[in-house]
A protein has these predicted regions:
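Conserved ABC ATPase "signature" region
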Residues: 120-138, 389-401, 424
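H-loop/switch region of ABC-family ATPase nucleotide-binding domains
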Residues: 203-204, 471-472
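ABC ATPase NBD Q-loop/coupling interface
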Residues: 57, 68-83, 350-359, 363-371
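ABC ATPase C-loop
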Residues: 159-160, 423, 429-430
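Catalytic Walker B motif of ABC-type/P-loop ATPase nucleotide-binding domains
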Residues: 167-170, 436-439
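A short, surface-exposed alpha-helical micro-motif characterized by mixed small hydrophobic
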Residues: 209-211, 477-479
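ABC ATPase nucleotide-binding domains
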Residues: 235-294, 508-545
Length: 545
């Protein structure tokens, strides 16, 4: 009998200075070749479990640990990340903290050099993993010129280049555009099916990955709350924690259709079987700039921004024309490297266009893509002193973490801390900027925390501040935005109402939009109304016969 690639017995762990256990008596086996999805709310223990499986807990983070854990046949309490590195690959939630080399090629060669691979073997492995992740064009780039999504691809490639027995991934699609995210899940499925690589993938956006998994585990308060098949998990989530259910599962639940579908393909097949034919998608997304008259919060006029990516200068923004009105809520979307972060940095005055202009007449506050850029203290409470800080911590659900080190928080908790810092800073200044820019703020956030972010954005909007959020999260954009601006190659390629843009695209579309085609529905609530209407019509036709 083959031993599990991960074996955990009664594992309890607490970070230094933490007030509570992050893992509490947890037991788990992962078999060779399994594809396991870890679900759970922010702070439920997913990140800590992955850190324990690769030795970062306790060897890097310290803290108190009890129980037993083995990974790839090694006792993790006696063997740290260096010993486990050949057999266990990790993609952390914050790739900027994981990438250590100057160039992309050097980063990918590093794990192979540590195993004394020959130059020829290193070259072949690097070329193959770069092709698999569609990133040969990045190999000679310097890492400090990469976008967040590009950096995440590099971290993925470095984890996969040595073909480990076990790959641990902590929200690996959080900074990837929908195309790259789908490609990644396809690659993981191929590694799993063709090479027998065990995959443990922690995700909040489960609609992307459940169909590829053999098994789904839900965590809560450092324990396993559910362990079963993806379909059983969706049924459990709808009954016990609907925030964990996929949009497609919520769509079917609201429409009174069961069982919940695992993925878009299965959902469409189930609807066809019931005679509820999805409407086929039509056309391209619109180009309809805003006509809202509230005064400009952001104006970009023929703006060109040039950056040196390590291989020479290139135009990141190419004569961009864009306008955001006061009080608007706008989602800025586009593939990795399309220019989203560059536009936000230009709006905040951190980059100057070579020609043209980008201006925020009422001022601009920016939450950067890397939340760690905002942390300068060793305690969460010290990052947010005073009444405004306490209120901001309570608003994001981190009041319990005042004594913790920001570095010990999960990725979602760090993201929430960064949001709290921006919220508290705005309150302390007493002046509301005309434009609030957030760069990928939903990374690591569960649905409940995303709802909190949406409520905060709507409050700012009601006070006449524009909120511009760069995001790859189409489900969040559908809930947050009134309008979507879609960038491609530094130019605006679509600009219009959120329902039109996110219902009309192939990749930049919500799960409900992909299930129901060109119906115009992008959220489960409206989609369920359409399905109920179709059911009534079908019943009427059947009765008439």
């Amino acid at each position: 009998m083959v031993d599990p690639v991960v074996r955990i017995r009664r594992l309890t762990y607490r970070y230094p200075s933490a007030a509570r256990d992050s893992l509490a008596g947890l037991g788990l086996d992962v078999e060779p070749g399994e594809f396991v999805v870890l679900a759970g709310r922010s702070g439920s223990g997913k990140t800590t479990l992955l850190r324990a499986c690769c030795g970062l807990v306790p060897h890097y983070h310290g803290g108190d640990v009890a129980g037993a854990i083995e990974a790839a046949g090694l006792d993790v309490r006696d063997h740290g990340p260096a010993d486990l590195g050949a057999a266990v690959g990790l993609v952390a939630q914050d790739p900027e903290t994981q990438v250590v080399s100057t160039t992309v090629r050097a980063e990918l060669e590093l794990p192979l050099e540590m195993r004394s691979e020959s130059a020829a073997a290193r070259a072949r492995a690097v070329e193959e993993v770069a092709l698999a992740l569609a990133m040969p064009h990045l190999l000679d780039r310097t890492v400090d010129t990469l976008s967040g999504g590009e950096l995440q691809r590099v971290a993925l490639a470095a984890a996969l280049v040595g073909r480990p027995r076990l790959v641990l991934l902590d929200e690996p699609t959080s900074q990837l555009d929908p195309v790259a995210g789908d490609e990644l899940i396809g690659l993981l499925r191929r590694l799993n099916e063709e090479w027998g690589t065990a995959i443990v993938l922690a995700e909040h956006r489960l609609e992307r990955c459940l169909a590829a998994a053999d098994r789904a585990i839900a965590m809560a308060d450092g324990r396993i709350a559910f362990d079963g098949s993806p379909r059983e998990f969706l049924r459990w989530a709808l009954d016990h924690d609907p925030a964990l259910a996929t949009p497609g599962a919520r769509l079917f639940e609201l429409a009174g259709i069961g069982p919940p579908p695992v993925g878009v393909k299965e959902a469409r097949q189930m609807l066809r079987h019931r005679g509820l034919e999805p409407i086929e998608a039509s056309g391209q997304p619109p180009l309809q700039p805003s006509t809202r008259a509230g005064g400009p919060a952001l104006v970009a006029g023929d703006a060109w921004v040039e950056l040196d990516d390590g291989t020479g200068p290139r135009d990141v923004l190419r004569g961009i024309e864009a306008r955001v009105e006061c009080g608007e809520r706008v989602a800025l979307m586009g593939r990795n490297g399309a220019g989203k972060t560059t536009l936000l940095r230009a709006a905040a005055g951190r980059l100057r266009p070579a020609r043209g202009r980008v201006a925020a007449p009422g001022g601009c506050a920016l939450l950067p893509q890397s939340p760690g850029d905002l942390f300068v203290r060793e305690r969460v409470g010290d990052e947010l002193p005073g009444e405004a800080g306490t209120a901001a911590l309570e608003a994001v659900g981190l009041d319990w973490a005042a004594a913790a080190d920001p570095r010990d928080l999960s990725g979602g908790e760090r993201q929430r801390l960064a949001l709290a810092i921006v919220m508290a800073g705005r309150g302390a200044e007493g002046v509301l900027p005309g434009l609030i820019c957030l760069d990928e703020p939903t990374r690591g956030l569960d649905r409940a925390r995303k709802d909190t972010l949406v409520a905060w954005a709507k409050d700012l909007s009601a006070r006449d501040a524009a909120v511009l959020i760069a995001t790859h999260d189409t489900e969040f954009a559908a809930s947050f935005a009134e309008r979507v601006v879609l960038l491609g190659d530094g130019e605006v390629i679509a600009d219009g109402p959120v329902a039109e843009v996110l219902a009309g695209g192939w990749y930049f579309a919500t799960e409900v939009a992909r299930i129901l085609g060109a119906s115009g529905a992008i959220l489960p609530e409206r989609g369920a109304e359409i399905l109920r209407e179709l059911s009534v019509r079908r019943a009427e036709v059947t009765e008439a016969r």
